[in-house]
Amino acid sequence: ADLWVLTQGEVDHTSLLSPPLSAADLQDQQRTVTSRAAENLFWLGRYTERAEFVVGVAWLALETLRSASPPVRQWLGEVTERHGLVPEGTPTPTQSLRVFERALALGLPAAAGVTSVGFNLRALVTCAQSLRERLSPDHWRLIQELDDHFEQHMASALAQSAREGGAAPVADVVGVLGRTSTHLSAVTGAQTDRMVRDDGWRLLSVGRQIERLDTLCHALARGLEAGLANSDEGFDLLLGLFDSMITYRARFQGRREMLPLLDLLVFDTDSTRSVAWVVRTLRDRLRKLARHDGAWAYEVTDPLPMPETWSIEQMAALDASGRPAELIAALHRTVDAVRELSSAISNHLFAHVAGADRSVWQ
């Protein structure tokens, strides 16, 4: 029941309720990002990008190996081995294509190990689960379904292979990888358009760009060293890896030349897969992210290259072996620089530096 108190004196209007927010309160409001959340966001970005890359590489390998030339087979074998998609000691595609295909297919589910496609998808789910308050319901559901559908359909494909005598179920696995790639595109779309672009989102983006720069620069450098750009199939493979096939055909119809290829994959600042775009985006977002610690942000990003200042004529110049040696060296230096940057971010910002619940930005 209500209780009314009568008094003859002045009434005290003090209230324990929070006062309404003022315009000044809203203007100064910053969302806190704890060290634990910061690390999870960073790795959510990295696992998303890593999953996209290994799914794409596995798909390209299984789709093209049987008709590929020896240089292309060798490059695909090196890239898949570097990313742990086949066990160490597996015969290369040039040594035994059948054994390599089977090892690649069997190494895709989560149970195969910490570098498998399935493990990366499971790690993506684990990071997302710790960030439920930052993800829309659709975003979270997409990530859950991605992992569940991949494991279910991959297990079905491999079980069918076992019943039929153990041959690599290439067509079935390629189909599963294609659907997984489409599902991952929906996840990255949710990250781009369904998240608030605060400091936490910028850290997620930084993680994605670090992973993208590392994987694409190394793959391109090894592809150029293997002479992939000198053949039609290798040319298409590089464009497919950078998801730039349609863009290249629209701009340079009927041309298969080194200069326009490098212009699109390395120097184009409008293509989200080009080296120049990724480096610039990584640098700008990290500096904006760490604006409260500007000296550190500039110190760790200054060693990153600036591809927009490179000379395309100089970088595309071929040496005696027909390879763009200067560009290859620059790509390897970029890989080294981005790995050092990743270590610097981890050492400076994340929970193992101090208390797990400390604020990184506020």
Segments predicted by a language model, with ranges:
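Alpha-helical transmembrane segments and their helix-helix packing motifs
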Residues: 1-362
